[in-house]
Structures are given as C-alpha cells and as structure tokens.
Curated annotation (Swiss-Prot):
Domain of life of the native organism: Bacteria
Cofactor binding notes: Binds 1 zinc ion per subunit.
Coiled-coil segments: none
Residues where GTP binds: R49, V50, H51, S52, E53, Q70, E92, G93, R94, T114, T149, K154
The keyword Zinc is assigned to this record: yes
Function: Catalyzes the conversion of GTP to 2,5-diamino-6-ribosylamino-4(3H)-pyrimidinone 5'-phosphate (DARP), formate and pyrophosphate.
Top-level EC class: hydrolase
Gene from which this protein is expressed: ribA
Family in the record: Belongs to the GTP cyclohydrolase II family.
Organism: Enterobacter sp. (strain 638)
UniProt-listed NCBIfam families: PRK00393.1, ribA
Alphabetical list of PANTHER family matching this protein: 3,4-DIHYDROXY-2-BUTANONE 4-PHOSPHATE SYNTHASE, GTP CYCLOHYDROLASE II-RELATED
Descriptive protein name: GTP cyclohydrolase-2
GO molecular function: GTP binding; GTP cyclohydrolase II activity; zinc ion binding
Residues engaged in binding Zn(2+): C54, C65, C67
Length: 196
C-alpha cells in the first residue's frame, strides 16, 4: 500500500454534504483527497470519478481544458446518484507540475498540441500514476466501481491494480472554442472517448 488514510471531515458543497478523506503517500508525503457522498458500503458498484488536479481549470476557470466542467459535473452526478466517490488525484498537469504546465501552455500558444508540448519539455504525454487511486479505493473499502471517465487508460490501470470497473460512464462536458483542439488531440493521440 503506497498510501495511508490520515484525516477526514465533513465538506458541505452546493451539491450536498460530502465526507472529505485525506490520504498521504508513504514515500513522498504528497497528499490526495477523496470526497465521499452517501453510504458507499454494500455490494452495489459505486459511481466514482478519478479527477486529476487542475488548478487552472478547477479553481481558475480556464477554458483551455474541460477539467473544471468535469469536476462540477462529476460532483453533481454523484450527488444525484445518492452515493459515490470523487478521488482528487494530486498530479497537476498530467503529473508534470504546475510550472511545467504553464510552460506547456506557452508552447501550445506557439502551435504545439498538448502532447507535443509535453514531449518538447521532455515528458511523456501522460505522466500520471493511477495505481495510487486503486489504493484509495481499497482504503475506502470499495472494489467495484462505475467509473466516470473518458480515458480508457484509467480503466486499464485501475483494473490491473485490482479495482473491478463494471462500467465506464462517459463524462463529456465543457467543449468550447478555446479547448476543442486540446480535446481533439486527447481523442486522436491519447485514445480518449469523447463522443457518446
């Protein structure tokens, strides 16, 4: 187990009250958070979203990506379902970090797509480690999920890590003129499924 569960508290939101559970990576001390809505115990698979940190989209309302739109839609869907989990995966910019993400944005402004920009900076298209999320699910006592994602790689990695993904639930929101090239690149070069 790469993580330990270290803290929890109630978190009221516009969609209802979630339980916020804090985790810490044993090796690095990096923190991650789960937002739990309702009773997630039992045999019924849990609706869940693994949401990677995106300061620009989640908190600064950037239109360059669909992250903030996905975060809001996922919390809303989980609350409507009456139970579910959002894992807030603290790997900013597909795990290249905030400053490198800003550098990647500058390269995108020069005409590179999101994958090419990462490569120009010496990174893979996606540096994230989703096995940490499997540990979070296990520490929450969940092993069967209906995963809110457009990314088949998340499904593969979580499945390989022992989480039974019984259904992939599309989360297609937030397309706009500022991010359509970004989304098209994610579909063409990273295999994201962006049509219903």
């Amino acid at each position: 187990m790469q993580l330990k569960r270290v803290a929890e508290a109630n978190l009221p939101t516009p969609w209802g009250d979630f339980l916020m559970v804090g985790f810490e990576e044993v090796a690095t001390g990096q923190d991650h958070v789960a937002l739990v809505f309702g009773d997630i115990s039992g045999q019924t698979p849990v609706l869940a979203r693994v949401h990677s940190e995106c300061l620009t989209g989640d908190a600064l309302f950037s239109l360059r990506c669909d992250c903030g739109f996905q975060l809001e839609a996922a919390l809303s869907q989980i609350a409507e379902e009456g139970r579910g989990i959002l894992l807030y995966h603290r790997q900013e910019g597909r795990n290249i970090g905030l400053l490198n993400k800003i550098r990647a944005y500058a390269l995108q402004d020069q005409g590179y797509d999101t994958v090419e920009a990462n490569h120009q900076l010496g990174f893979a298209a996606d540096e994230r480690d989703f096995t940490l999320c499997a540990d979070m699910f296990k520490l929450l006592g969940v092993d069967e999920v209906r995963l809110l994602t457009n990314n088949p790689r998340k499904v593969e990695i979580l499945t390989e890590a022992g989480i039974n993904i019984v259904e992939r639930v599309s989360l297609i929101v937030g397309r706009n003129p500022k991010n359509e090239h970004y989304l098209d690149t994610k579909a063409a070069k990273m295999g994201h499924l962006l049509s219903e």
